[in-house]
Structures are given as structure tokens and as C-alpha cells.
UniProtKB/Swiss-Prot annotation:
Membrane spanning residue stretches: 1-21, 30-50, 61-81
Assembly behavior: Core subunit of respiratory chain NADH dehydrogenase (Complex I) which is composed of 45 different subunits.
Entry membrane topology: Multi-pass membrane protein
Subcellular compartments: Mitochondrion inner membrane
Gene that produces this protein: MT-ND4L
GO molecular function terms listed in the Swiss-Prot or TrEMBL record: NADH dehydrogenase (ubiquinone) activity
Catalytic reaction(s) noted: a ubiquinone + NADH + 5 H(+)(in) = a ubiquinol + NAD(+) + 4 H(+)(out)
Family annotation (PANTHER family): NADH-UBIQUINONE OXIDOREDUCTASE CHAIN 4L, NADH-UBIQUINONE OXIDOREDUCTASE SUBUNIT ND4L
GO biological process terms on file: ATP synthesis coupled electron transport
Gene Ontology CC terms, in alphabetical order: mitochondrial inner membrane; respiratory chain complex I
Highest rank taxon of the organism: Eukaryota
Family indicated by similarity: Belongs to the complex I subunit 4L family.
Keywords: Electron transport, Membrane, Mitochondrion, Mitochondrion inner membrane, NAD, Respiratory chain, Translocase, Transmembrane, Transmembrane helix, Transport, Ubiquinone
Protein name: NADH-ubiquinone oxidoreductase chain 4L
Length: 98
């Protein structure tokens, strides 16, 4: 395993550990999810470029589109929860049920 793959994998693991440690706050969870998606994007892009997979060259762009949609939905949920309850605790999401 080259150093590039090791560093990207380490970034993914650190984001996953951050998600597990800071899971009580919504903002911290969203930042860790973005770190995971960014490391997956870089890993896919590097793998496709090194192995010359021309048919799979759209996969990182599709992943980036889904990451942007996830970030927008998460940010809107964060704004709604913080305006309603004043905090960004994940446990407040249970109170938003209709």
C-alpha cells in the first residue's frame, strides 16, 4: 500500500472515529461525515486515475453530487433544530416528529 492510500485511509478512519466520539452534536457529526465523503472521493479519484478506468470516471463526480445534497439537507436540518430548540444536540431530532 502506497503512502497516498495510507494517508487517505487514515483520514477516513479519523473521520469515522470523530463521528463516533462527537455523535451528540449535529454540527460535529456533519463535519465528520463531510471528511469521510471527501476521503472517499479522493480515494476513488486516485484509484481511477492510477488504474486508467475510463468507464468509471463519472463515479467520483456522482459521489460528490450526493455529498453536496447530503450537506445541504444536513445544514437545513441543523438550522431548523437550532432555531427551534437553541442547541444542536442530536437528541432533539426525536422531538421533530409530526
Amino acid at each position: 500500500m502506497s503512502m497516498v492510500y495510507a494517508n487517505i485511509f487514515l483520514a477516513f478512519i479519523m473521520s469515522l472515529m470523530g463521528l463516533l466520539v462527537y455523535r451528540s452534536h449535529l454540527m460535529s457529526s456533519l463535519l465528520c461525515l463531510e471528511g469521510m465523503m471527501l476521503s472517499l472521493f479522493v480515494m476513488m479519484t486516485v484509484t481511477i486515475l492510477i488504474n486508467h478506468f475510463t468507464l468509471a470516471s463519472m463515479a467520483p463526480i456522482i459521489l460528490l453530487v450526493f455529498a453536496a445534497c447530503e450537506a445541504a439537507l444536513g445544514l437545513s436540518l441543523l438550522v431548523m433544530v437550532s432555531n427551534t430548540y437553541g442547541t444542536d444536540y442530536v437528541q432533539n431530532l426525536n422531538l421533530l416528529q409530526c
